[in-house]
């Protein structure tokens, strides 16, 4: 059996002291692949550095995390998108809508999410979706953009049974 860790942020500074040790532990535990979704423009280089150190083990995704959407979102989204032509990515992520902590940029999160879903469709790449307290908004965007053509994962699922059923009608897991 091939084991894939579909979502981690091992490249973040919090893991610096043990980063190589954690990669070794993952490999020794039978994990064959790490998929690394990006957070924002400040984490891109660190993510790439980790993937460059472990080229047959760690694979990058490109995206702008919903909690990183702020007053500078348009500039940050453009910079994030610019990387798509510079390297190979295994997916678009971490993307989504998160209304758990703050709803200040709810409209902007939806706009950013839908744009990144279009990247996924245009590039034929799977998505890693982050959603908290925003299932109606996420599903509205998925169906608006074309859920029937998307593949990928919800990296965390805290929804109810009806929301789980809605996921089952997509190509997302």
State the predicted function of each range.
Residues 13, 69-70:
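A generic structural signal for short coil/turn motifs at secondary-structure boundaries
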Residues 170-173:
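Conserved small/polar residues in nucleotide/adenosyl-binding loops
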